[in-house]
Amino acid sequence: MKNYYSVLNECAVKNQVLFAGSTFAHDFPINELMQDFDVDARVYNRSEKGAKLADARDFVMEQAEALEPSKIFLCFGDEDIKAEGFLAGEFSYEYKELVSDIKKKFPDCQI
């Protein structure tokens, strides 16, 4: 996964919101919705087009370590489900493992 976010993360405000996912999340109009609903938080979209959950674990953890968010929204699965040989049980297990890893490293973070 790309790491061009590292420069942006140096300027980011800690204790805000991390939004991480794949194509759907990458294209999601977060800023527009924040304005429409007067959200008083900074949301950092660190999503990658084409990302699959299995490839994203290290990337998500890296972004969380850099941003130290108070909340994390995960939005993976849109690319996984299209992949040949997709197994729902395996995907569910990997998702739970990612959430568990985040909770261990960032116990005060809401997911």
Where are these regions (language model features)?
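Hydrophobic positions in alpha-helices of CheY-like receiver
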Residues: 98-102
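Active-site segments of SGNH/GDSL-like serine hydrolases
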Residues: 75-81, 103-111
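Conserved SGNH/GDSL esterase-like catalytic core that processes O-acyl groups on lipids
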Residues: 1-96
